[in-house]
Regions:
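Short, acidic loop-to-helix structural element flanking the phosphoryl-transfer center
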Residues: 55-88, 94-99
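Membrane-proximal envelope and lipid/glycan-remodeling enzymes
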Residues: 85-97, 116, 156-167, 172-175
Length: 175
């Protein structure tokens, strides 16, 4: 059975939406997804506000309240019928996120066994046929086939198969 690894943030969980919401509320601004086209949030806001961005990510409840990406639950459940599915999240970038990410996955994806959740900073260690991720840095080093999940920051990235949503993931893997 072929193996698919799936990133969590910006693929299964809308971390960017929550990050924008908290940033905009804190500063009374209206930064939008369109403002981020081809850029990370960190590149759009002034460097004197990076500490607030970091504090948002490190807040205890940040990863608990993320919205689920539309159709991800249904499609991942279907994928499990034909593939070995693992969740691979780069939690090392925000060490305070381990427990919250686990709780979030248990709440929204209870059908994914704990043994299929991998916390890793460098996804080149994964042994899988496919990796679905929004971060091209992770795909570059991955040994299998990288699938780029669209997010505002990666809109200018080429060189990978791209999916824009979970319906396209479903079509790609299940026809």
């Amino acid at each position: 059975m072929k193996r698919i690894c799936v990133d969590m943030d910006e693929v299964m969980a809308d971390a960017l939406g929550e990050h924008l919401l908290r940033y905009n509320q804190h500063f009374g601004e209206q930064v939008t997804l369109e403002d981020l086209h081809g850029k990370w949030l960190w590149e759009v806001v002034s460097s004197d506000r990076h500490a607030v961005l970091e504090a948002c990510l490190r807040s205890e409840d940040f990863f608990d309240v993320l919205a689920v990406m539309p159709e991800s639950q249904r499609v991942l459940r279907r994928l499990q019928m034909n593939y070995e599915v693992f969740i691979a999240t780069a939690a090392m970038e925000v060490p305070t996120s381990f427990q919250a990410k686990y709780r979030w996955l248990a709440k929204h994806f209870p059908f994914i066994p704990a043994s299929h959740i991998v916390y890793c900073g460098d996804k080149s260690i994964l042994r899988a046929d496919y990796l679905i991720d929004d971060n091209p840095r992770q795909l570059r080093r991955f040994k299998g086939e990288g699938i780029l999940y669209s997010s505002p920051h990666n809109m200018g990235v080429t060189g990978y198969k791209r999916v824009n949503d979970w319906l396209e993931v479903e079509q790609m893997f299940l026809g």
